[in-house]
Amino acid sequence: MRAELAVYFIAGTQDIVRGTLPSVLEEALKGGITCFQYREKGAGSLQTASERKEMALECQKLCAKYQVPFIINDDVALALEIGADGIHVGQTDEAIRQVIASCSGKMKIGLSVHSVSEAKEAERLGAVDYIGVGPIFPTISKADAEPVSGTAILEEIRRAGITIPIVGIGGINETNSAEVLTAGADGVSVISAITQSDDCHSVIKQLKNPGSPS
């Protein structure tokens, strides 16, 4: 799971500024992302279940073509219906124990955490495959984001002896990803770093190898 978290792209229709979600996703897949989470939320997102399912299936097909895990944010029923590779939920989405009961053994389970105690609980549960920790830096992509934690939260989690795979989240781009990895994350998740880039292949290369020339 750790390798799959290296460059974890998150996006929904609401995040796309040029082109379409499938076209942006395919460019990112060609560029080398290692995981994709379909997150359809907020202003500008698809509003009907049928639209979201149709888009999810299109994105899932692209991920399968490039052999990259396809994860759905929050919507357990949709993830189960279409056979997603994973489900990611937050602390205020469906209760994690309910998600585990429905999904464990069928797909990977990711959980957002914002403190050492939440990280400890995620590891204690045993069925959570990875945690998303953040927001590390200020973010424009999530209107309901928690307060910024900085990279210190990653160091605190690792110092506490927590070994569960971690992907850093929130305001991460090619200029600050090295800090996130050095602090203890196994990978970085990005939205605008890819969706707003004129050259996502270069961005992804730098996210995978911080300090490398673009």
UniProtKB/Swiss-Prot annotation:
Cofactor(s) the protein needs: Mg(2+)
CDD domains from the UniProt entry: TMP_TenI
Alphabetical GO biological process terms: thiamine biosynthetic process; thiamine diphosphate biosynthetic process
Protein's pathway: Cofactor biosynthesis; thiamine diphosphate biosynthesis; thiamine phosphate from 4-amino-2-methyl-5-diphosphomethylpyrimidine and 4-methyl-5-(2-phosphoethyl)-thiazole: step 1/1
Pfam family, one: TMP-TENI
Residues the entry annotates as binding 4-amino-2-methyl-5-(diphosphooxymethyl)pyrimidine: 37-41, 73, 112, 142
List of residues binding 2-[(2R,5Z)-2-carboxy-4-methylthiazol-5(2H)-ylidene]ethyl phosphate: 139-141, 171, 191-192
Residues reported to bind Mg(2+): 74, 93
InterPro entries: Aldolase_TIM (IPR013785), ThiamineP_synth_sf (IPR036206), ThiamineP_synth_TenI (IPR022998), TMP_synthase (IPR034291)
Keywords: Magnesium, Metal-binding, Thiamine biosynthesis, Transferase
GO (cellular component) term, any one: cytoplasm
Cofactor binding note from Swiss-Prot or TrEMBL: Binds 1 Mg(2+) ion per subunit.
Main enzyme class: transferase
The EC number(s) this enzyme carries: 2.5.1.3
Reactions catalysed: 2-[(2R,5Z)-2-carboxy-4-methylthiazol-5(2H)-ylidene]ethyl phosphate + 4-amino-2-methyl-5-(diphosphooxymethyl)pyrimidine + 2 H(+) = thiamine phosphate + CO2 + diphosphate; 2-(2-carboxy-4-methylthiazol-5-yl)ethyl phosphate + 4-amino-2-methyl-5-(diphosphooxymethyl)pyrimidine + 2 H(+) = thiamine phosphate + CO2 + diphosphate; 4-methyl-5-(2-phosphooxyethyl)-thiazole + 4-amino-2-methyl-5-(diphosphooxymethyl)pyrimidine + H(+) = thiamine phosphate + diphosphate
SUPFAM superfamilies: Thiamin phosphate synthase (SSF51391)
Domain of life from the UniProt record: Bacteria
GO MF entry, a single one: magnesium ion binding
PANTHER family in the cross-refs: THIAMINE-PHOSPHATE PYROPHOSPHORYLASE (PTHR20857), THIAMINE-PHOSPHATE SYNTHASE (PTHR20857:SF15)
Role this protein plays: Condenses 4-methyl-5-(beta-hydroxyethyl)thiazole monophosphate (THZ-P) and 2-methyl-4-amino-5-hydroxymethyl pyrimidine pyrophosphate (HMP-PP) to form thiamine monophosphate (TMP).
Similarity-based family: Belongs to the thiamine-phosphate synthase family.
Protein name, per record: Thiamine-phosphate synthase
Organism: Listeria monocytogenes serovar 1/2a (strain ATCC BAA-679 / EGD-e)
